[in-house]
Curated annotation (Swiss-Prot):
Belongs to the ABC transporter superfamily. Heme (hemin) importer (TC 3.A.1.14.5) family. ATP binds at residues 34-41. One of its GO terms (molecular function) is ATP binding. It comes from Gloeobacter violaceus (strain ATCC 29082 / PCC 7421). This is Hemin import ATP-binding protein HmuV.
Length: 275
């Protein structure tokens, strides 16, 4: 379990996170949602150990995150940032193979190469293996980086859960690859990993996440299954947006229909949930 206990983050005299308590459990996808500036990326970076909390603590598998040696932590926890910069002309296969560095210490064996190939297939980039990374589109680069972080924790050490942290993994992707990427994340969770992902699209979160955490102004408003979080009341509190929330006719999950921040419903209409 990845656990944030009362964490607060203060930078440049401003609290970016305040008193956040959150748990990410093996076998589930936890989606962090909220408006711009809510603290979503700050929370993910704090869970990843990139930002040390001003208050509170973060633990992984019952052990304080700060007490994990860097290489051991990298063997079980992988992070996909919003932007990954790589200017050198590596082949795509070489970029994905870099994910195996914590395990191989730079001496990759055949098993590492096989894992890289499997991760590329999972991320849908196997056909790009021999392409030079700088020649790829933004969406292709994002999917290659997803393959890299998958390869990093493809196999967990014995008796150790894995943690996959994704910061807006669908931001530069087309509709097809938004869904395929989140399907990969969900499948990874089904293999026993704890997946935490920052998402802006509430309908994607409803479809693929087991639980949602709604942030606003650095505070955690509510956490729970999609039916609990994705209500017209919570969405208006978090985003200042009026919505209709209905039941998806095929998937059964909440379906959020924006009405606009200043919309006025017609007489007789109600903000509905589950209808």
């Amino acid at each position: 379990m990845l656990k944030a206990a009362g964490i607060g983050v203060r930078l440049a005299g401003r609290w970016l996170l305040e008193q956040v308590n959150l748990e990410a459990l093996p076998g589930e996808v936890l989606a962090v949602v909220g408006p711009n500036g809510a603290g979503k990326s700050t929370l993910l970076k704090t869970l990843a150990g990139e930002i040390r909390p001003t208050r509170g603590s973060v633990s992984m598998a019952g052990k304080a995150l700060a007490d994990w040696p860097a290489r051991e932590r990298a063997c079980v926890r992988a992070v996909l940032p919003q932007n990954s910069t790589l200017a050198f002309a590596f082949r795509v296969f070489e970029v994905v193979l870099m994910g195996r560095t914590p395990h191989s210490r730079g001496l990759e064996g055949e098993r590492d190469r096989q894992i890289a190939r499997e991760a590329m297939a999972a991320a849908g980039v196997a056909h790009l293996a021999e392409r030079l990374y700088p020649t790829l589109s933004g969406g292709e680069k994002q999917r290659v980086q997803l393959a890299r972080v998958l390869a990093q924790i493809w196999e967990a050490p014995p008796d150790s859960p894995r943690y996959l942290l994704l910061d807006e993994p669908t931001a530069s992707l087309d509709l097809t690859h938004q869904h395929s990427t989140l399907a990969v994340a969900r499948n990874f969770a089904h293999r026993g990993a704890a997946v935490v992902t920052v998402l802006h699209d509430l309908n994607l979160a409803a479809q693929y996440a087991d639980r949602l955490a709604l942030l606003k102004d650095g505070k955690l408003l509510v956490v729970g299954v999609p039916d609990i979080v994705l209500t017209p009341e919570w969405i208006e509190t978090g985003f200042g947006l009026q919505t209709l929330v209905m039941r998806h006719p095929r998937l059964g999950c909440p379906l959020v229909i924006p009405l606009g921040s200043a919309s006025v419903l017609q007489p007789g209409e109600q903000l509905a949930h589950g209808k």
